[in-house]
C-alpha cells in the first residue's frame, strides 16, 4: 500500500 508517512509505496514496514 501507499505509505502516508514516507510518501512512497511500501516504505512503511
Curated annotation (Swiss-Prot):
Location in the cell: Secreted
CC annotations in GO: extracellular region
Main location: secreted
Keyword vocabulary terms for this entry: Amidation, Neuropeptide, Secreted
Modified residues (Phenylalanine amide): 13
GO biological process: neuropeptide signaling pathway
Protein name: Lymna-DF-amide 3
Species classification: Eukaryota, Metazoa, Spiralia, Lophotrochozoa, Mollusca
Amino acid at each position: 500500500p501507499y505509505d502516508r508517512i514516507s510518501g512512497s509505496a511500501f516504505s512503511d514496514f
